[in-house]
Amino acid sequence: MASLLSSSLPSCLPSLLFLLLQLTSSSAGQFRVIGPGHPIRALVGDEVELPCRISPGKNATGMEVGWYRPPFSRVVHLYRNGKDQDEEQAPEYRGRTQLLKETIGEGKVTLRIRNVRFSDEGGFTCFFRDHSYQEEAAMELKVEDPFYWINPGVLVLIAVLPVLLLQITVGLVFLCLQRRLRGKLWAEIENLHRTFDPHFLMVPCWKITLFVIVPVLGPLVALIICYNWLHRRLAGQFLEELRNPF
């Protein structure tokens, strides 16, 4: 029995070494793909960057790197054979993406998306493929209205306060000038011994009120109209993207 084992061991040794080398090479080629651990936020019309890297870090120049959008696997950007494959992009992303490859030698890449749209909101998947081995990571993009912080109350406050302060200041200056002018005229009239009606220079209250209120209401109405127009335009853009995603 011992002689049988000793005679068969040398013949099995090459097979064991080959299997060990295969396992070692297989484990050496494995890596993990890591994306941002939180949702990335962007405003409509701006540009956004989606970072992605492999761990442990290694040169990814010869790998296939890309981003796609689930659930239909629409290609957002694809890098293969050392160059970008623009012809394989989904139509809505052509001309809007750029792969930043300055640190690809360390296994780090970033996808830049220009002119962000409402339809870009949602999930993205980044993947690295090295021959037959592939890993990927999911990330989320949230798109916000650049005027989301403006509501009618804030708009009224922004519009009314500066104009109201300006009109109060102008009104006070106007009243001071009126009183000074009336005093000078009184002195001249007394010197000339003319009759003078004290109500001649009195300005009716409704005129002063109109002088203060009209300049306030004008800009306020204009700002409200501008606010509604901007929101209708953004809403129309969003509906148009939903109707024609491609």
Curated annotation (Swiss-Prot):
SUPFAM superfamilies according to UniProt: Immunoglobulin
Disulphide bond pairs: 52-126
Biological-process GO terms, alphabetical: cell adhesion; regulation of cytokine production; T cell receptor signaling pathway
GO cellular component: external side of plasma membrane
Cited Pfam families: V-set
Extracellular side of membrane: 29-153, 231-246
Tissues showing expression: Found exclusively in the CNS, where it is localized on the surface of myelin and oligodendrocyte cytoplasmic membranes.
Highest taxon listed in the record's lineage: Eukaryota
Membrane-topology descriptor: Multi-pass membrane protein
UniProt-annotated glycosylation sites, renumbered to this chain: 59
Alphabetized Gene3D superfamilies for the sequence: Immunoglobulins
One of the record's GO molecular function terms: signaling receptor binding
Ig-like V-type domain span: 29-144
Keyword annotations from UniProtKB, A to Z: Cell adhesion, Disulfide bond, Glycoprotein, Immunoglobulin domain, Membrane, Signal, Transmembrane, Transmembrane helix
Function: Mediates homophilic cell-cell adhesion. Minor component of the myelin sheath. May be involved in completion and/or maintenance of the myelin sheath and in cell-cell communication.
Family indicated by similarity: Belongs to the immunoglobulin superfamily. BTN/MOG family.
The protein's name in its UniProt record: Myelin-oligodendrocyte glycoprotein
